[in-house]
């Protein structure tokens, strides 16, 4: 049987570390998940071993709290944005090798404390659903910059199916996600090929004119 739970009873919420881009590097001691990079290269999850775009680093000298460090299967949650539509993006952090990583400014780490009740991957999909995002928007504050406080998120009640049902749902959605990602990459390759081919044709045309 499933159950109804309040998010605050099964998850913890921690603010990310505020570190400017000027102190980010191509190599370093900690992977750093910057808020601005999430919208430009990631969708639903961050795979540390095969990221859809390079993940920057920060150095060990930065002042980072233990609560700001990411663990495998944490959810990187965006609760601050310049538009309401961008609020509530959730990214599952897949880090099976447990590489040192820090969640960045304007992000919140959602960590599942009760894995006997919810699989992190299932919760990530649930938090990305239109129904949940609609509930989240009830708590939006601000005029120019919009925010939802983690304390408000922790009060949201969700209904969870049995763990085995969650595993089946995650398996199906992961399969769809993987196929979608492959198609996106393929479309990107085709677009680059078309641009190159069009440029070649144009050059040949110009040469023939001369």
Predicted regions and their residues:
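Non-catalytic DNA-recognition/assembly elements of restriction-modification systems
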Residues: 1-21, 155-210
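Sequence-specific dsDNA recognition surfaces
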Residues: 8-25, 37-81
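A short glycine-rich beta-alpha junction/loop motif
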Residues: 19, 100-108, 140-170
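Short, well-ordered beta-strand elements within core beta-sheets of diverse protein domains
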Residues: 58-62, 108-114, 155-160, 174, ...
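Short, positively charged
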Residues: 121-152
